[in-house]
Amino acid sequence: MATYVQTNVGLYWGGYSLASSFNAIALHLSNSPQDDTVYGDTTVSNASGLSTVTLEAEGFWQSTTDAVLQASLGSNEVISVTPVDQSAGSPSIFSKYTTSSYNPIAKGEVGSMMGFSLSAEGRGEKSVSGEILVIPATYTTSSESSTNASIGAVSATQSVYSALHVTAASGTLDVIVESAPSNWSGEATRITHTQFTAVGAEMKSAAGAITDAYWRVKWTVSGGGSFDFISSLGII
């Protein structure tokens, strides 16, 4: 199993790419077990409780990043972290969060960099460990699709999740997620994202069972415009 040194982490916060302002990101996944021990048990028993997703991060203050983070306080955002790089097939961890705290001047001493810190809490969605299908770039072609990816089937107890971050917009953008039983024929549309005409983000899902193992993202740019976006897919 490969290990990585953090040098090219990506952070997509709603409709913004903010990694260049950050120098530390931590994701915490937990569960709140509930004691269900009864007479006759010889050891403590716990039932699975509610799951929790938390993001904590810090970095160096910049006015443009500060404006985004202040506006997001108390609001819901789709956040994706790409812990290795932003290549197709690289890991992407995403979920919906509510920004619970933002400290624009978390630390600052004479002669040192002015730093900020923040925390965000999960907004009713599990954390999805997926992979990047569409790399962050500028797309102008009227209709394109990502390289087909063998991500696997979706069982009856699972769902497939798609995270889309649009960081620059001109015209209209329509994005769908397709699956196919082979590489590539017999495709079916599984997820249809809301049409984008401005920067923003969206996380959508489709419930299983889906027996297809191959997946791709397909998009159409209309109105003579161009869009910068990144798209990730995961199954949990």
Regions found by a protein language model. Name each.
Residues 1-58, 62, 90-121, 126-131, ...:
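Solvent-exposed edge beta-strands and adjacent loop segments
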Residues 9-11, 76-89:
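Short conserved beta-strand and strand-loop elements enriched in small hydrophobics
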Residues 63-66, 165-173, 184, 222-227:
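Extended, low-complexity, turn-rich repeat/linker tracts enriched in Gly/Pro/Ser/Thr and Asp/Glu
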Residues 113-115, 157-162, 208-228:
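Noncatalytic modules at the cell exterior or secretory-pathway interfaces
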Residues 116, 129-131, 223-236:
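Edge beta-strands of jelly-roll/beta-sandwich modules across compartments, strongly enriched
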Residues 147-158, 166-168, 205-210:
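Extracellular and analogous surface-interaction loops
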Residues 174-178:
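Beta-strand signatures of extracellular beta-sandwich domains
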Residues 188-198:
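Solvent-exposed serine/threonine-rich low-complexity stretches and specific carbohydrate-binding patches
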